[in-house]
């Protein structure tokens, strides 16, 4: 607590955006509300005349509005009354659903968006970016053009092709319960077999054991047939997952096991906190020079 507030005088932002309150850094903040209040320090420190960009769909939207010191708010999401939203359905296509199309609605008009990112949470992130762009005067067509030029951040739901032609969804950059759920939502939409390579989720404090048990349950609910886990905490996930779950003490052994089983009808999600260095697993499974198909 207080870290965001301490930085605000240095930056003096005219736009403040919090994408969501996620189950991360619970070890330091104690609860989800603690996380949300720490993130809300951004809104509390905005100057008069600045714009607060608020996720209207988030559980803590009302808290952030109460904390907002700016004179202007631009909301985004699917909630009724949101300033920046979507009309109609989201249509996914491309390898592992890596292209999403939708109609963007802003106070200035509408535009068709072709977003080259997987995951419904990335549509929500795109709405946040659109709301910020609207706040600085960019029209709907300009926003749509910018969103269409986006590319995945390395290790954030990057779709690649592994040995044997399997799809690999590289989400190895970091992990917490919220981002794992988002990754599993993407995996659940894939055809064929769905596998999960899971590393520890760090900085969860007293919630760590239950969070990893819930990870095993969530994987099963997402239709995952095989769970390959590594890390001190992921044994809880394997125990909860049951049949098809395997725990490894060594990354090389995990890679050898996964590589020996992969086939073209498999999609595998790779997810874990930075401490696991799961990018090494990705590098071992993806042939050099191959990123997608």
Place the predicted regions along the sequence by residue.
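Active-site beta-alpha connecting loops in nucleotide-dependent enzymes
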Residues: 153-155, 172-247, 273, 290-293
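Short acidic-hydrophobic, aromatic-tinged amphipathic segments that line or gate anion-handling sites
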Residues: 245-257
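Switch II (G3) loop of P-loop NTPases
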Residues: 4, 168-174
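Acidic, Mg2+-coordinating active-site environments of NTP-dependent enzymes
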Residues: 8, 14-167, 192, 217-226, ...
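Short glycine-rich anion-binding loops that position phosphate/pyrophosphate groups of nucleotides
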Residues: 1, 22-24, 57-59, 174-175, ...
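Short amphipathic alpha-helix with an adjacent loop that forms part of the alpha/beta core around
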Residues: 9, 255-263
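Nucleotide and nucleotide-moiety/phosphate-recognizing core
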Residues: 163, 200, 237, 252-255, ...
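Short SAM/SAH-binding signature in class I
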Residues: 15, 128, 262-271, 277
């Amino acid at each position: 607590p207080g870290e965001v507030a301490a930085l605000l005088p240095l930056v003096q932002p005219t736009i403040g955006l919090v994408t969501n309150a996620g189950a991360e850094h619970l070890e330091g903040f104690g609860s989800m509300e603690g996380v949300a209040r720490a993130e809300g320090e951004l809104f509390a420190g905005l100057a008069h005349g600045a714009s607060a960009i608020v996720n209207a769909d988030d559980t803590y939207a009302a808290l952030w509005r109460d904390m907002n010191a700016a004179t202007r708010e631009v909301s985004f999401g699917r909630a009724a009354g949101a300033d920046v939203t979507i009309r109609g359905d989201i249509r996914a296509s491309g390898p592992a659903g890596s292209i999403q199309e939708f109609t963007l609605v802003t106070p200035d008009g509408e535009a068709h968006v072709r977003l080259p990112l997987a995951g419904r949470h990335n549509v929500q992130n795109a709405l946040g970016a659109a709301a910020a762009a609207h706040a600085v005067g960019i029209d709907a067509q300009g926003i749509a053009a910018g969103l269409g030029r986006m590319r995945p951040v390395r290790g954030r739901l990057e779709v690649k092709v592994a040995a044997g032609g399997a799809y690999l969804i590289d989400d190895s950059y970091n992990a917490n319960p919220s981002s794992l759920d988002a990754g599993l939502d993407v995996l659940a939409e894939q055809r064929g077999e769905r596998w999960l390579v899971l590393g520890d989720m760090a900085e969860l404090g007293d919630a760590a054991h239950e969070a990893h048990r819930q990870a095993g349950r969530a994987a099963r609910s997402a239709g995952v047939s095989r769970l390959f886990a590594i890390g001190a905490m992921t044994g809880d996930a394997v125990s909860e997952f049951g049949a098809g779950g395997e725990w490894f003490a060594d990354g090389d052994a995990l890679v050898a096991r996964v590589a020996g089983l992969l086939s073209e009808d498999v999609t595998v999600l790779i997810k874990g906190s930075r401490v696991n260095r799961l990018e090494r697993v990705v590098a071992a499974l993806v042939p050099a020079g191959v990123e997608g198909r």
